[in-house]
Design a protein with these regions (language model features):
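Right-handed parallel beta-helix/beta-spiral solenoid domain characteristic of secreted/periplasmic
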Residues: 293-323
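Short, aromatic/His-centered strand-loop micro-motif at the edge of beta-sheets
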Residues: 151-173
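Flexible glycan-contacting loops in extracellular carbohydrate-active proteins
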Residues: 197-225
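Sec-dependent signal peptide cleavage junction
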Residues: 21-39
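Extracellular glycan-recognition surfaces and repeat-rich motifs
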Residues: 51-85, 294
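Acidic Gly/Asp/Thr-rich repetitive segments characteristic of extracellular carbohydrate-active
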Residues: 67, 71, 245-291
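Secretory/extracellular carbohydrate-interaction modules
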Residues: 82-148
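Short tryptophan-centered beta-strand motifs in secreted/extracellular beta-sheet-rich domains
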Residues: 170-180, 185-187
Length: 323
């Protein structure tokens, strides 16, 4: 089992991974060529834009089995998918069996899901999602079972860890970040890192299938707004990234003029030895947790610091992280 640790109101340096360094760095005013991370959005499905469930995009399929699937109206998100199974029997699922993500091409994989666990009667387990390789081995898992009070995940085989609180009948943003090279992953719920650097259920060098499902005696109802799976190549050239309260997460982040805005954006990126992450002086990020992905080495650390003039930036790490 993995040790669990709560981080509440700690200093910024408490959440830095191995090979990271806190410092203040002057801004270089010249132009710098930056190698862009090669990112491929492998598959995405967004039910809010759909009129019906016919002809789903990008190899997504729904299997009703002993359950029922509907495109329903939601007061917050418009159209969403409702998957409901009230009796034991065959599997109901939303599935994509053609991810075709291989370690020799992509190192990092992120799965972002906007989901609501329904308050309808439920029993046992609903998988949200299970991810398999081309041989059918289950490599990564996230699921709800029992009284649906917390998400759970398998690590090192079938050892189980809690992976964040379930807010029944409320929309939650769930993100899984997978490192195919290290066979590790992390889970973030609504921007808070709940599991980090934990081992996969099974080691693999590829991902083939993702499935949200309930089968056999498992019952319950879930609502899905969208799912996005992104495979990303590893960067080889270090760079400097900027973060500002006046930034824009849709921009490159590689200059003060194209700075990112949120810690969520920083936390979603993969940093390498020699990278610098600089926060603008005078800025403040409240009730957010900084937990960058990646690590440096003895000779070339990842530097977290500041740029500009004025008061040093403030970050309130008022979240929870399990390691």
């Amino acid at each position: 089992m993995q040790k669990q640790t709560n981080w509440r109101g700690r200093l910024l340096t408490c959440v830095l991974a191995a090979g990271m360094l806190m410092t203040s760095v002057p801004v270089y005013s010249g132009s710098v060529a930056v190698e862009a991370a090669s990112e491929t959005k492998t598959t995405k499905i967004d039910f809010s834009t759909m009129k019906n469930l016919d002809n789903l995009p990008d190899n997504w399929k729904i299997q009703n089995g002993s359950g029922n699937s509907q495109l329903v109206d939601d007061s917050e998100n418009g159209k969403v998918l409702k998957l409901s199974k009230t009796n034991s029997g065959n599997e109901i699922s939303l599935k994509n069996s053609k991810l075709d993500i291989n370690e020799n091409e992509y190192r990092y994989v992120s799965i972002e899901t906007k989901i609501k666990m329904g308050s309808e009667t439920h029993a046992n387990q609903f998988s949200i999602p299970y991810i398999k390789d081309s041989k059918g081995n289950t490599a990564y898992t996230l699921y709800a079972d029992g009284n649906w009070s917390s998400y759970k995940s398998h690590v090192n085989g079938k050892n189980t860890l809690e992976a964040g609180k379930i807010s029944v009948d409320k929309w939650q943003d769930i993100r899984m970040d997978i490192d195919l090279k290290k066979d590790t992953f992390r889970v973030t719920i609504d921007g808070e890192c709940e599991l980090a650097g934990v081992n996969a259920r099974a080691k693999t060098d590829n991902l083939s299938e993702i499935s949200f499902y309930a089968d056999s005696w498992n019952t319950g109802t879930i609502y899905i707004d969208s799912v996005e799976v992104t495979a990303e190549k590893e960067r080889t050239q270090s760079a400097t990234f900027y973060v500002s309260n006046n930034g824009d997460d849709s921009k490159a982040g590689t200059s003060p003029e194209t700075a990112w805005k949120s810690l969520d954006k920083v936390n979603s990126q993969h940093f390498i030895a020699g990278d610098k992450i600089l926060f603008e002086c005078g800025g403040e990020w409240k009730n957010q947790t900084l937990f960058p992905q990646g690590s440096g080495d003895e000779n070339s650390k990842i530097t977290i610091g500041s740029y500009g003039s004025g008061n040093l930036p403030k970050i309130s790490t008022n979240g929870k992280m399990k390691d």
